[in-house]
Each structure stands twice: as structure tokens, then as C-alpha cells.
Amino acid sequence: MRYGFYTLDVFTDQLFGGNPLAVFPDAEGLTDGQMQKIAAEINYSETVFVLPPVTETGNFRLRIFTPKRELDFAGHPTIGTTYLLGLLQPPSPLVTTTWQLEEPVGLVPVTLHYKQGQLVQTELTVAQLPQTKDSAPSCEDLALLLGLSIDQLQQGEYEPQAYSCGLPFLFIPLINEEALNRISFNPSVWQNLLAGQWADCVYCLAPGDPSLGLSDNKLIHGRMFAPGLGIAEDPATGSGVAALGGYLDDRLDTPGSHHWQIEQGKALGRPSQLQLTVVKDGQGIRAVKVAGRSVLVSEGFMNLGN
């Protein structure tokens, strides 16, 4: 059997920027084991397999695999796959359209934004609003994990804390971008400190303007490390940025629609831009949205024998 696939760069408008993604747009007939082996063979952060929907309201069903395991939800695969499907199976007419994507976390609404008939970007709305639980390890231990001094970690209002919109992340705010660039991640410390914990993906953050609190910044820099998923460092992490919406929301007092740009991937030479929107009212958070652009890179076939 031959299965067609495409590769894209996600959360960028530049070839060879952003986060690479492989998508199999017609994955019917593949077993769970084959999907996992294919994801390990391609060895991107994630590989997506598209299947027919199983609900009345779903447009497509996505299965998302890292080199090590399947995920309930992931941002850059959702954003990039929707972009690809918008090219392969465009809506008619070519106007802004929202599809419902079936993922293990639930139905994920994704909006395809068109401008003058051209697909510009895609934007997901999380199926699961941010949740938080578990206390974070001490700042002393986290400084050791990152190869930093403890005074390079923020404390107080912006202390480390874990959130999830389907995939948990431990957020560690640092004092500035210089500290972020100096990270020397220690996998051995991670193994002893976080392996097997609810949030074992580590997302480090730095304010664009260190004179302002993280939630008051419009620009936030980030780096994400996920040894448990087989990802040493990720160039762009949509599910992490979605969960970040919960971290920032808990530190915001003003209702309304709040927007941030998250820049990630610089340390890997793959700069990425992710747009985060949090909508809240007097009762709390109402919606979290993550948007970005994608670039189609290549297409090919994988031969799996008879």
C-alpha cells in the first residue's frame, strides 16, 4: 500500500521556519501500530493521520502522534492540518469558514481565514478550557533543571505553575529573554524531577518588556522541552500556548478580549509566531484561541508493502 503525505512548516510564513509537520490526508486502513511507527520514522514533533469523521457535526477526524505516543490534542498539528485540508478540499465559496475537527480531547473548532480568495491563516478554539493542578517543584530544583541561577526565575505572582487544555505544561517564567537564551536543559534532572508527573512538558517564558508583568506584555518569548514525548525542544507549541492562556488569565483582572504574540523557535533557527487570544467576562475565561500561518513544503508517498 502507498499512502500519500505532505509536509508543512507551521506558525510561520517562511519556508524552513516554524514547526515541521507531516500529514497523511487519507489514512484509512492504517493500524494504530503503523501510525506510531510512521511517526517515529518521520521523527517530527508530530505526525497527523486524517480519517473520516465519526460524529454528525465533525468534518474530519485527526489522530496525532509524536515519535513516542499519541496525543489527545496538539496545536501545531491542528493548525497545519486544517491549512492543508483547506488547500486540498477548499470550501466553496472561498470565504472564512469554521470546521469541526474530531480529536480525542473533543470537537475542536478551527476557522479558515481567507482574504481575496487566498487562505491566509487558521485559528483553533480549544475544546477544553485551561485546567490547573499539582504544585510545581521548587525554584531551586527548576533552576537546576534549566542550568540557570535561581534569581533568573520569576517568583511571586509569576511563579511556576502547570496548566492544560488537553496536554499539560509546566510554565516557568524567567526574568528576561537573555535568561531564556541561556537555558541548558538537563534531561537527567528532568527524569528525576518530572518524568511521570501530570505536567512533564516544560514551557519556559520571558516577557518582551521585562519592566511589565508577563500578562501585561503583548509579546512573550518561549522555549518548550518535552523529553517524555520524544521532543528535545519544540520550535512552536500551539497546545502549550493555549494552556498559557489559562496561566495568563488567572493573572488578569479585566474582562474582555486579550491578545498576545508568542515567539518561539529562535534557539533552533526556526522562528515561529503564534497568536493567542483569551476571552473572559466577569465569570471567568470563556474562550482560548490560537492562530497562525502555515507553508506547504513537500509531498510524497510512503510504501508499506502489500
Swiss-Prot record:
Family annotation (InterPro entries): Phenazine_PhzF-like
Pfam families: PhzC-PhzF (PF02567)
Coiled coil feature spans: none
Protein name: Uncharacterized isomerase slr1019
Gene Ontology CC entries for this record: cytoplasm
EC number assigned by the record: 5.1.-.-
The entry's keywords: Isomerase
Catalytic residue list: 46
